[in-house]
Each structure stands twice: as C-alpha cells, then as structure tokens.
Amino acid sequence: MKKLITCGAAVLAVFCACDKNIEPEPAPLAPPAEVWLSASSGTSLTFSWTEVEDAVRYALRLDRSDDGSNVSQTSVTGTSHTFSGLETGTEYVFKVRAVASDDKLSSSYSEEYKAVPGSSTPDPDPEPDDPDDDPDIPDGAYEQFRISPDEDAHGLALAFPGAEGGGMYTTGGRGGRVIHVTNLNDSGEGSLRAAINESGPRIVVFDVAGIIELESKLRIRNGDLTIAGQTAPGDGICIKNYATVVEADNVIIRFMRFRLGDQGSNADDGEDAIWGRRQRDIIIDHCSMSWSIDECASFYGNSNFTMQWCIMTESLRRSVHDKGEHGYGGIWGGENASFHHNLLANHDSRNPRFDHPEIYENPSDPDMRGNVDYRNNAVYNWGSNSSYGGEGGHFNMVNNYYRQGPASRDREYFLDANGIYTSSGTDYGYPYLYMSGNYYLQYPDMTAEDGVYWHDHHTNTPPDPTRLLSALLPISGPDGQTVYTTTHSAQAAFDRICEVGGASLVRDEVDERACHDAETGTATFTDGGNGSTGGIIDTPSAVGGWPEYSADTGNEANDKTDSDGDGMPDWFEERFGLDPDSASDASGMTLDRHGRYSNLEMYLHWLVRDVMASGTEGGSYAALD
C-alpha cells in the first residue's frame, strides 16, 4: 500500500512539474479547537473559543437543549460573545464556526457546548495562546502587566484592565486608528480638538505635555473614541478655559485634567469642567476636575456609565455664575450607572446632588433613568450641604466615607433625601435606597436608618422607611451582561483614593492639596479670594493658579520614539518581542494570554499598571447583581 501511494505521488509530481501554473486547492478552515464557558449569570452566558487563523469572523448559534429551537444566530469578529435575556435554569447548546473570506472555505461547526444560566460554572481559560510560549516574548511577560487575577478568572474583554461598573464594557476606539496629539493648540492639525472631531474608531495618544487653553467648548460629538491621557510625557495634560462636553456614545477618557477657571468669555455662563448626558457606554477613569463655575463633573441621564477613581475639588463659589454663589461637586445619576472610588472635596454643595425626573426630557417617563450604584466615594469639607436629592430614583449607597472640614455645616446624615422637587413643587416620592457600610468620621455609629434625612420641604410629608431596601439594586451591562466592581471598607476606600485617585500617574499640586487636606481635616488655603473661607475658594488665583506641566518630569511615557507610528514606542516593542518597524503588531494579541486586549491596549495599560493594581489592593471583586 505504501508503495502505491509513493508511485501515485511521483506521477502527481511529474504532472505538476509539467504545468507549474496549476495552484493547489485551498483547504477549508478548521473549526475552533476549543470552546469554553467564560462567564455565567442568572440570565446570561458568555462563551469563548480559540482563534482560527485566516478567519474573518465567527458564526455563532445558540439553541434550547430541550426542543432544539433556535435562540440566537449572529456573527462576531472577536473570540468571545455574551448571550443575554436567557431563562434561568434552562439548558442551552452553543456552537461556533470560523468564516473565511470565501464562504466556501468556512469551517464546519465546533463541538457543541451545553450550559445553564445561573447554574453552570465558568471553565478555567485553557490559555491556548500563552505568550510565554512564544520564543520572541520574554518569559513571565504577562505577569509584569499586573492584571487582576479576578479579571483573568472571568476572561471578559473590558474597556481596559481595571474598568468596573456600568460602563465597564465600553469599547471606545478599540481596533481603530491611532491619532497622535503633537501640540497644545486649541485647534488645527495635531491638536486634541482635531483628533476628537475625526470619526470612526480612534485612540488618541499624546506626544506633548502641558496646558491646552481652549478657545471654545470641547465637544465630543463622534463616539468610538479613547482618549489615553496616560500616554502624555512628564506631568501630563490639563485642559483650561472651557468645558469638555461628552455628546456621543462609546467614549473612554483616562488620566486627564479638566481645570476650568474663571478666565475668558466662558466666565458668565455657568460652565462645568466636564459633563455629559443622554449618552450610552461611557467610562471616565482617573481624571481630575477643579475650578468649575457650576459643577466640576455632572453626568446623568446616561446609560451604562462609570466614573471611577476621579478627584473633583475646589469648584468656585463666589465667582462669576449669573445666579450668584455656586461652587458645586456634581449632579450624578442615570441608568446602570456607577460612581465609585471618587473624591469630592471643598465644594459648597452637590456632593453629589442625585438626579431628579425634571432633568430628563419626559419627567413622567424619564428615559435613561434607572439603578445607580454609588460606592466607595469620599466626601470632604462640604459647605452648606453634602449629598442630597434623588427624587423618585433608585440608588445604592455602599461603603462611602464622609468627613467634615473647616467649612462644613454639621449635616448629621449621609443623604438629604428629597421627594418633592422644589422648583416645580411636584412630589415624585422619596428615592429608593439600599444603604450599607457608609461611614461618617464625626458620627462613627451612624446607621442606615439614622443616615437618611427625609426632607419634607415644610409639607409635613412623613419619612418613608419603606424606601430603605434590604437588597442591592442590580447593575447590568448594555446587553444584560454581569457587571463587576471592587469594594473596600469605607475607610480603606478613602485611603486608596488618596493614594492613587485622579490623574495620578504624575500627580499635580492641586490633587496633592485635596488629598492632604482630606487626610488631615485641614484647609491649606483659608482665604478663598472673594469672601469664602475654610478651603472653599472663589478663584484659582487664591490657591496659586494653574501648575506648570513639564514634559521632562520622570515618566515611563517620556521616550516617544515610535518608528512605525502604531502608538507603541520602540522601547516597549523591543522589551516584549514585538517589531518596532511593523505597525501591524499593534492589533495583535500576543501579549494578553487570554486574548482580550490588543498589544496597543496592553501598552496603554502598562503605563498605569501599578496605579491600577494599587487601587484594587485589599478590595473584594464581585458582581453587582
């Protein structure tokens, strides 16, 4: 038999030698070699599979096991997908095939995988593409990125390693162009505004450090955007003079400073430092906001939103707002919205103000208003009021830290809960509240029941303790995915925020002052400049004005040599066995052994790996369901 095959092969070889133009028939793709369950909740299943070379996408099919009826057929370009809205306790059957550019060469379906939402336990990742097995990548490379073991356990692709809460699945500019900011101009080629005004998926990186003095509002109107402030050299980037407004879906903003001030023509219209409403899929991470004329950072009416690890301080009280005294922290709310590990310091009020129905276009049926998770935030040195509002809303208040400062009125509560919106007199009912683990330094024994002031606005509306809930209000992803967050005790969260909150890759003196004052219970500056005292300020000049932001301060992002222009500097590519002369490896996934993040995304994480790891240290990572 072996001889016959050999002879046949010889004849074939002679035939081919006579006609070299005959191409061998291409082989069809193989199906994914392995399929596994990477996450499961009561109503969702997340499946992952191994990558197939030359596949342009993957066709997925999910059927019920009991009757074989089809539940979903879809296609994706990645190697993971979540099916939502499933029935708890029902068994489903999943399979996937690799699709080629020529569909005739697409693979057959993989072996079937059966799973039950709420019962099946996710599998350990088989790690088929461990970068440590790649001879070009140094041993132990993946461990150097310090990605949380909890995130590795569920294996989900997040906005970035360390993204948590309602906006954790935001994709931003993933897979898009890299746009370099090369100057500090307000507009024009190489400016931040020009990069933001582009369309399509894009990741904005910075080759410069310093202050961008805006000449008009910076409006983000085109989504699918990642602004990676951590890529700036030295002291980083600060935005001045006008508000930044998020008016698009699918936006990631990280390690930026928004220090508005009272200069220029913005001074009479009640500007916030940064704000956004009525958008979807947004995450604001490790940013610093100050010197607003109205609120420092207001985000409400957004769906699947997260603001995490931010510092908001020193809004301007007796400034140039046309309504007179202001100086507020922010208005916070939305639907599946998370606000965690943030510091609100030195604001007269709105620390925060939880949203109310009349903020929305239809108060009787407000779109994008739902459950809000407010946890592990720290509030220090309010003036007239701390946290209040929430008419008719739904809020978790978990493990937050409150501390009076030199300017603080004695507010003996965690929340001043409103039922009546005073401007219209409409009674929307008190908010529904799940309260647990909150801590007030001056009143350490305060309980959840004691910590709510039911504000009746002189209408004799009685307190409504039935609005205090016994179970957590769930937060879910845009397609019903399970949402996770890290929770510390209130005191530990305060310590973590002061350690790594804000644009802390290189922290400036404004954030240093905010954290020092909050930790010591003091006010570095007692004269606010126009009559305010005790750390509440009226003008930036009262605290020394804007710091200088040098490009020369020690920072791992300082060496900007990037021969192939792919957003990853040569030193990083050389360190991890990539090719500094080939831009194609930016989109590869050789550095993430779990196949979630591109090499470019891993570089963006590399710059802040220690900040992200330090923040979650000592916390408990769990689903918000």
Give short role names for the model-derived ranges.
Residues 20-54, 88, 105-122:
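Pro/Thr/Ser/Gly-rich low-complexity, intrinsically disordered linker/stalk tracts
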Residues 52-73:
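Extracellular low-complexity, O-glycosylation-prone stalks/linkers
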Residues 353, 358, 368-544:
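Extracellular beta-rich repeat passengers
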Residues 224, 229, 249-260, 278-291, ...:
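Right-handed parallel beta-helix
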Residues 83-102:
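Beta-strand-rich modules
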Residues 158-204:
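Acidic Gly/Asp/Thr-rich repetitive segments characteristic of extracellular carbohydrate-active
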Residues 42-43, 193-200, 211-228, 236-254, ...:
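Extracellular beta-strand-rich solenoid/capping regions of secreted or surface-exposed proteins
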Residues 544-625:
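Extracellular calcium-associated, cysteine-rich motifs in secreted modular proteins
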